[in-house]
From Swiss-Prot:
Gene3D superfamilies with a match to the protein in the record: Ribonuclease H-like superfamily/Ribonuclease H
Lineage, highest ranks first: Eukaryota, Fungi, Dikarya, Ascomycota, Saccharomycotina
Location of region: Disordered: 1-35
Any single biological process term in GO: rRNA processing
Name used for this protein in its record: RNA exonuclease 4
Organism the protein comes from: Candida albicans (strain SC5314 / ATCC MYA-2876)
InterPro entries: Exonuclease_RNaseT/DNA_pol3 (IPR013520), REX4_DEDDh_dom (IPR037431), REXO1/3/4-like (IPR047021), RNaseH-like_sf (IPR012337), RNaseH_sf (IPR036397)
Length: 285
C-alpha cells in the first residue's frame, strides 16, 4: 500500500519540533474515496445522447469528476482514445485532432478509479533562484483517462520562480489551492492498492514524500523499448508520444492532466510487454 516515505517521517519529526503556523504534520490514511457522485453521474450518462465533452475542471476533492459535467464540446486525441478504446489500443484509430466524445449509459463503469491510475505533477521553484522544486499541481487519472484528482497545491515555502513558461502555473492559481498535507492525503487515498503508472514517477512520489510498492509501479521511463528511442537514456514523454502515437503534446506550457493521460496511453499501448518486463525484472531480483 502507499505510505509515507522515510524522508517524510524524518522531515515531519523535525517540523514538529518547531510549532510554527503552516507546519506540516504526518497525515494519517483514513476513510475511502467518496463515491457520492456516482449515482448522479450514471443519471447524466443515461440521459446524454452524442454529447461531446471533456473534463477540464480543477477539483480539490477525491470524488470522480464526471466527463459529462464539462461544457467543452470535444475531447483531445489522448482523452478520446483512452475513453473509447476499452482494451488493446489501436494506433490507427487515434484521432489527430480534437473529436466529439461519445457517451452512453454503459460508460458509467469507466468512472470508477479501477485497478490502474496514472499520476503527474507540476512543480514551481523555491529557494535561491528557484533552483529547488515544490509541488504546485497534481493530477491523477484512471485507466480510461477520467480525472480523479486535479488540483493546485499551495507550496509550504515562498515561491521564487513560478516556472510559468513550462508549468503553466501563476500566483493567482494559489487562491483556490489546497495545502500540501491535504494533497498528500488525497494522493495516498487514490493510489492505495493501485497499480501506479507514471513517467519518472519517483520524482512525483519524492515531491509528495510518499512511497509505493515497487511491484505496483509502472514507470514508462524505465521500459526498455521506450529507452531505445532515447539511445538507452531516459526518454521524454513528448518524444515517446510523438514517436508511437504521432500526436504532439507539451506545446508550450505543460498540463499535468494531459501528461498523465499520455503516460496511461503509452502504458496501455504496450501493457502486455511492460507487464512481462516487470515479471522478468522481479525474477532477477
Amino acid at each position: 500500500m502507499a505510505k509515507l516515505s522515510q524522508n517524510w517521517k524524518k522531515l515531519s519529526s523535525k517540523i514538529q519540533d518547531k510549532p510554527k503556523n503552516g507546519s506540516v504534520k504526518k497525515p494519517t490514511l483514513k476513510g475511502k474515496i467518496s463515491k457520492k457522485v456516482k449515482a448522479s453521474i450514471s443519471e447524466k450518462l443515461s440521459t446524454t445522447n452524442n454529447t461531446t465533452t471533456t473534463t477540464t475542471t480543477t477539483t480539490s476533492t477525491t470524488d470522480v469528476v464526471p466527463i459529462a459535467s464539462s461544457t467543452k464540446p470535444t475531447a483531445t486525441p489522448l482523452e478520446y482514445t483512452l475513453w473509447t478504446q476499452n482494451h488493446t489500443i489501436n494506433v490507427s484509430h487515434i484521432p489527430k485532432t480534437p473529436k466529439p466524445l461519445p457517451l452512453s449509459r454503459n460508460d458509467s463503469r469507466k468512472l470508477d478509479p479501477g485497478k490502474y491510475v496514472a499520476i503527474d505533477c507540476e512543480f514551481v521553484g523555491i529557494g535561491k533562484d528557484g533552483e529547488e522544486s515544490a509541488l504546485a499541481r497534481i493530477s491523477i487519472i484512471n485507466y480510461y483517462g477520467v480525472v480523479l484528482l486535479d488540483t493546485y497545491v499551495r507550496p509550504q515555502e515562498r515561491v521564487t520562480d513560478w516556472r510559468t513558461w513550462v508549468s503553466g502555473i501563476q500566483s493567482y492559481h494559489m487562491q483556490d489551492a489546497i495545502d500540501f498535507k491535504t494533497a498528500q492525503l488525497k494522493t495516498m487515498e487514490l493510489i492505495n492498492n493501485k497499480i501506479l503508472v507514471g513517467h519518472a514517477v519517483n520524482n512525483d512520489l519524492d515531491i509528495l514524500f510518499l512511497s509505493h510498492p515497487k511491484s505496483m509501479i509502472r514507470d514508462t521511463c524505465k521500459f526498455p523499448k521506450f529507452r531505445e528511442i532515447a539511445g538507452g537514456k531516459s526518454p521524454s514523454l513528448k518524444k515517446l508520444i510523438k514517436h508511437f502515437i504521432q500526436v504532439d503534446i507539451q506545446i508550450g506550457q505543460h498540463s499535468s492532466v494531459e501528461d498523465a493521460r499520455a503516460t496511461m496511453l503509452l502504458f496501455r499501448l504496450f501493457k502486455r510487454e511492460i507487464e512481462q518486463s516487470m515479471r522478468n525484472r522481479n525474477k532477477r531480483q
